[in-house]
Amino acid sequence: MDFEQISRSLLPLLGGKENIASAAHCATRLRLVLVDDALADQQAIGKIDGVKGCFRNAGQMQIIFGTGVVNKVYAAFIQAAGISESSKSEAADLAAKKLNPFQRIARLLSNIFVPIIPAIVASGLLMGLLGMVKTYGWVDPSNALYIMLDMCSSAAFIILPILIGFTAAREFGGNPYLGATLGGILTHPALTNAWGVAAGFHTMNFFGIEVAMIGYQGTVFPVLLAVWFMSMVEKRLRRVIPDALDLILTPFLTVIISGFIALLLIGPAGRALGDGISFILSTLISHAGWLAGLLFGGLYSVIVITGIHHSFHAIEAGLLGNPSIGVNFLLPIWAMANVAQGGACFAVWFKTKDAKIKAITLPSAFSAMLGITEAAIFGINLRFVKPFIAALVGGAAGGAWVVSMHVYMTAVGLTAIPGMAIVQASSLLNYIIGMAIAFAVAFALSLTLKYKTDAE
């Protein structure tokens, strides 16, 4: 493959060198921020040798080349375009300026939660293991092994406000360590553990205001709002405090002001917001049942196109941290939608006689089955439209099944086949059946519907 030739072919189709604001790449895609998106010819770009798909998302023109190829194309492209290397964060900053307010909020929440997903996934896997140990009586609950497993599985959720405080402060422009400190205040041992409230809690009289001494372990919205407020306070203090006193006074005043406001006002308000969202969703799922799964499973892939799905991490973490819920009933639905995209894409592989399309569909379908759907959605299914519609129907069918069968997950971040690792042991069989339904429905519809499957 001639990477220099690919780069030379790309430039005029992107509006020329002067239209390239920045270039970066991820594992599979060349990510470009263009001065004027209208100058790019997506259809022509898709016909270039080596290009597996092309789409606009999150303010970027993203061209799919695949693992092991994209880095070589990128190296040749920045030389041909005469631009300097950009990090993914720099490209994302430029792209963010093109996003609408909803997409910016979604991107912000994604940047806050993605770094802490490994901790939540680890805890979720350990919770699943602990559940199996408890269900099958492998180890007595008083045994040291059981106690240590319990400690390891719950740790990330107990200190979740501290983890969120750190990453949120970084995104809001505050000091991450002050953000973590504020998260620590909200989970201080002086406050009754949020999961032990049923046994009773005490209140504190603060100048005539009765403050409930309840901790915020496992919560999301209280610390998000509190750290946003803290970052605003910190930035304003830095403007007025002399440099000589900045190191001492700014952290001191920031923590005491934001800490008091968080405990008295923001924390209770954030808890009410989180509980309200959880209540609405759980009520909808419990009362609408499979109809809710049908709706959510069918619409999820449409939401993915907008990029707003990144904001769901916050809601899912809130469900897991809520003592009255403690499970993620949304992620199994999203997983069905992702599997359906893989099924619809796989059907295109059987239908098409175009060698180039055939070369793209198989890896794209496999990627979707692992929970990464961009290549399948933008590279194949949306390109031919009807496979995307088939995937929506498959996602709806799978979503209806997992909701009706009460399939729950114990973490966030993993969907499709990898999601099996964080599914509750009692739900695993129905999760697999749901994937089979989503895949089969999407595959069958995509295979039987009539549409052109060539690169033209």
Curated annotation (Swiss-Prot):
Protein EC: 2.7.1.211
Organism: Klebsiella pneumoniae
NCBIfam families per the UniProt record, alphabetical: EIIB_glc, pts-Glc, PTS-II-BC-sucr
Active site: C26 (phosphocysteine intermediate)
Limits of the PTS EIIB type-1 domain: 4-87
Gene field: scrA
Lineage per the UniProt record: Bacteria, Pseudomonadati, Pseudomonadota, Gammaproteobacteria, Enterobacterales
Annotated protein name in UniProt: PTS system sucrose-specific EIIBC component
Record's comment describing the protein's domains: The PTS EIIB type-1 domain is phosphorylated by phospho-EIIA on a cysteinyl residue. Then, it transfers the phosphoryl group to the sugar substrate concomitantly with the sugar uptake processed by the PTS EIIC type-1 domain.
Occurrences of domain PTS EIIC type-1 (ranges): 107-456
Primary subcellular site in the record, as a coarse category: membrane
Keyword line: Cell inner membrane, Cell membrane, Kinase, Membrane, Phosphotransferase system, Sugar transport, Transferase, Transmembrane, Transmembrane helix, Transport
Bilayer topology: Multi-pass membrane protein
GO cellular component terms, semicolon-separated: plasma membrane
Membrane spanning residue stretches: 112-132, 144-164, 181-201, 209-229, 247-267, 288-308, 329-349, 360-380, 388-408, 428-448
Catalytic activity: N(pros)-phospho-L-histidyl-[protein](out) + sucrose = sucrose 6(G)-phosphate(in) + L-histidyl-[protein]
